[in-house]
UniProtKB/Swiss-Prot annotation:
Cross-referenced PANTHER family: 3-OCTAPRENYL-4-HYDROXYBENZOATE CARBOXY-LYASE-RELATED, FERULIC ACID DECARBOXYLASE 1
Role this protein plays: Catalyzes the decarboxylation of 3-octaprenyl-4-hydroxy benzoate to 2-octaprenylphenol, an intermediate step in ubiquinone biosynthesis.
Localization terms from the record: Cell membrane
Pathway: Cofactor biosynthesis; ubiquinone biosynthesis
Binding sites annotated in the UniProt record for prenylated FMN: 175-177, 189-191, 194-195
Cofactor(s) this protein requires: prenylated FMN; Mn(2+)
Active site: 287
Database matches in SUPFAM superfamilies: FMN-binding split barrel (SSF50475), UbiD C-terminal domain-like (SSF143968)
Gene, per the UniProt record: ubiD
Main location (coarse class): membrane
Protein name stated in the entry: 3-octaprenyl-4-hydroxybenzoate carboxy-lyase
Cofactor note: Binds 1 prenylated FMN per subunit.
Enzyme Commission numbers on file: 4.1.1.98
Quaternary organization: Homohexamer.
Length: 488
């Protein structure tokens, strides 16, 4: 099923029993986090808080709190169907030349579908039904959550940030948290390698001293939100990918101020600018690591205008020790990653990002090993192939007789197939998540790979062990005998 906007998705979830409305007063300060955290850990529904304490605007929480709801948001019925989305993205990243005329004709519908999904510009939009400008702008009217007791203040978490570098036609969409520090000011926390930060850097180089236009969409349709966190190939915009997921073009409307296009169906849009010289200390905030992050300086976003729908809904979340919503998103998007990796490395059988590893800090890869040193090639490939794995600190590679998603299997392989000196690869001075306080330098640290595969001649001089497996005849006899044993 496809969803026109966030409200359409809410209606679908409610009809399926996947969303509950809460009419009891709940405080956006701390209480909503505790309610959502307990609900997520119980694999419970999305929550629409209809009476946030001190506010008239309802708050939507725990929207992507189960892998199935992530799949539904991407237009699929279950998580397994996300492999098809990954296969499409893998094809678009590296389309193979047609093998003949018939093959060329068979590929034509795919390219036509992609070309037809460019965004559609509209003049009027629901997100601009109400306009608030100048001195009337007050972020304090939004029920922004303060998530944890040690947080520096309210934090906008599902901010879909829209930017464009100088002389660029294509806009960048990224989700960057924003700390509210005043009536019309937030701190934009984007890391140096992210698209928004790169656009800002280019702007400063080309137009020094000039304010950088920025817009933030809150409460976009699920396809647009999820398109911003999916590994979309450079040849396809996030808006175009959202159109593919939705099955219809993403409708965009020009901001009333900056020359930027925002999702027409968004609940709320913040329009404004960042001045190159305006920064402020951001944090601390409880993060997906389970710890409070360090305080660091980031640009200040000044909000010049707020536009929104009539009776808008504020979409929010929290981050904390896994499982949290980012971890659940990681579990679902894992299925998108697998076909993309297999396209580049056909020997890969499965790929798994354990949610306990903060969504991306550890990866387990199973493969069909074909030659000595093969596992090391694969682990180096994982680190370098997709931007999403730039911060993956630990990569475990093992044979395809191991279940990558079963820790008992993985630990067995590591403890029986590895020599710590021979089978580890350590790389120093690599990019590391700024939130990773374990690294010796902020943003720079090491990575380690574990080769837990069977060793081939050339990797060892010893006779390799043979796994213990019961023969099929005995298993069949015991299967027939089992009901008579009274052991169930």
């Amino acid at each position: 099923m496809k969803y026109r906007d966030l409200r359409d998705f809410i209606s679908k979830l409610e009809a399926d029993g996947e969303l509950r409305r809460v009419d009891v007063e709940v405080d956006p300060r701390l209480e909503m986090t505790e309610v959502c955290d307990r609900t997520l850990r119980a694999e419970g529904p999305a929550i629409l808080f209809q009476k946030p304490k001190g506010y008239r605007m309802p708050v939507l929480g725990n929207l992507f709190g189960t892998p199935r709801r992530v799949a539904l948001g991407m237009g699929a019925e279950d998580v397994s169907a996300l492999r098809e989305i990954g296969e499409l993205l893998a094809f678009l990243r590296q389309p193979e030349p047609p093998k003949g005329l018939r093959d060329a004709w068979s590929q034509l519908p795919v390219f036509r579908k992609v070309l037809d999904m460019g965004p559609k510009k509209v003049r009027r939009a629901a997100c601009q039904e109400v306009v608030v400008e100048g001195d009337d702008v007050d972020l304090g009217r939004l029920p922004v959550q303060t998530c944890w007791p040690g947080d520096a203040g309210p934090l906008i978490t599902w901010a879909l940030v829209v930017t464009r570098g100088p002389e660029k036609e294509r806009q960048n969409l990224g989700i960057y948290r924003n700390q509210v520090i005043g009536r019309n000011r937030t701190i934009m926390r984007w890391l140096a390698h992210r698209g928004g930060a790169l656009d800002f850097r280019d702007w400063q180089r080309e137009r020094p001293g000039e304010p950088f236009p920025v817009a933030i969409a809150l409460g976009a349709d699920p396809a647009t939100i999820l398109g911003a966190v999916t590994p979309v190939p450079d040849s396809l915009s996030e808006y175009g990918f959202a159109g593919l997921l939705r099955g219809s073009k993403t409708e965009l409307v020009k901001c009333l101020g900056p020359d930027l296009q925002v999702p027409a169906s968004a609940e709320i849009v913040l329009e404004g600018h960042i001045h190159p010289d305006d920064t402020a200390p951001e944090g601390p905030f409880g993060d997906h690591t389970g710890y409070y992050n360090e305080v660091d300086h980031f640009p200040v976003f000044t909000v010049d205008r707020i536009t929104h729908r009539r009776d808008p809904i504020y979409h929010s979340t929290y981050t904390g020790r896994p499982p949290d919503e980012p971890a659940i998103l990681g579990v679902a998007l894992n299925e998108v990653f697998v076909p993309i990796l297999r396209k580049q490395f056909p020997e890969i059988s499965d790929f798994y990002l354990p949610p306990e590893g903060c969504s991306y800090r550890m990866a387990v890869v199973t493969m069909k090993k074909q030659y000595p040193g093969h596992a090391k090639r694969v682990m180096l490939g994982v680190w370098s192939f997709l931007r999403q794995f730039m911060y993956t600190k630990f990569v475990i590679v093992t044979d395809d007789d191991v279940n990558a998603r079963d820790w008992k299997d993985v630990i067995w392989a590591m403890t029986t197939r590895m020599d710590p000196k021979r089978d580890t690869v350590m790389i120093d001075n690599t990019p590391i998540d700024y939130l990773d306080f374990a690294s010796p330098v902020s943003g720079l640290g090491s990575k380690i790979g574990f080769d837990a595969t069977h060793k081939w001649p050339g990797e060892t001089d010893r006779e390799w062990g043979r796994p213990i497996v019961m023969d099929d005849e005995t298993r069949a006899r015991v299967d027939a005998l089992w009901p008579k044993l009274g052991l169930d």
